[in-house]
Amino acid sequence: MLVPVPNAEEVSAENIKESVDAATLNGKLYGYPMTADNGYFMYYNKDYFTEEDVKSLDKMLSVAQAAGKKVAMEFNSGYLYSFFGNTGLKLSLNEDGVTNACNWNDTSGDIRGVDIEEALKRITSNAGFLSCPNGEIADKMKSGEVIAGISGVWDVMNAKEAWGADYGACKLPAYTCAGREVQMASFTGYKMMGVNAYSKNKDWACKLADWMTNEENQKIRFTERNQGPSNINAAASPDIKKVAAIQAVIDQSKYGTLQRVGNSYWDACKSFADTILSGNTGGLSEQELMDVLVDGITASTVK
């Protein structure tokens, strides 16, 4: 149990809204935002891609295919959200805090679930696409097989080692679905500091947490550890814009959603994505496959 932040109004005003939302429950702020870099984006090798190329996944796959290389992501994972998040279809956590609400199998919108499914089949069957575990992308960058990959700040040193001066990072690209360009989405995450409600010195602990997460210390944390600040003033620093990976996180966050999903989401996405990758639907129609995905996402894990 955490202590509500006593100077919540002040802390909220100093940090980006999304980081404050992440630390808020039932209208009360329970954490001091500290970083805003826990997201994912696109790394790319500038020797192969221009800044215009990386705006389009179709173009990136075309470039990779022509070069005999790959654009990589861990497709059979929660990253699947990237293709659904900005289509008008919805995924959310129910009020019980355990189960999910999801309409990814909708048949009535401008973009239907089966439209996304068809786009995913086209993307994953492209010779320039590679699905692999996130932990393997760095090695494939270094081997030369992968010239672009979706990952996070944890891979920044690997990307720099692999591509040197040609290392680049940017927001996720758009992909083609139902005849239109759809900006890929992402889950966003934030680190924060909280105070134990059972602390014998709660007041002093709150003061310490407030100080450790203030503007100056977030700047120091960026300088010494390359961690992206949640503090508005610290994030506006010109030095931030010089670090491609941190700037990519910030740019992608405009198209992201706070990661709040029930546990059933993860296994359902993996199963669906594995089916897409294998091409073996077990005789299910496209709509039936989408229905199975949504049934899995919305299933209760409570025994």
Q: What is the role of each PLM region?
A:
Residues 187, 224-230, 234-235, 241-302:
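C-terminal capping/gating helix-and-loop segments adjacent to ligand/active sites or protein-protein/ligand interfaces
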Residues 1-40, 169-172, 241:
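Hinge/lid segment of periplasmic solute-binding proteins
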Residues 17-55, 75-100, 187-195, 267-275:
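Periplasmic solute-binding protein
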Residues 161-224:
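Extracytoplasmic/periplasmic substrate-recognition and gating elements
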Residues 99-133:
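Glycine-centered hinge/linker elements that transmit conformational signals in sensory
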Residues 57-58, 129-142:
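Short helix-initiation/N-cap motifs at beta->coil->alpha
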Residues 147-152, 168-170:
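Paired acidic/hydrophobic, glycine-rich loop segments that form the ligand-binding mouth/hinge
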Residues 60, 84, 139-144, 148:
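Hydrophobic residues within well-ordered alpha-helices
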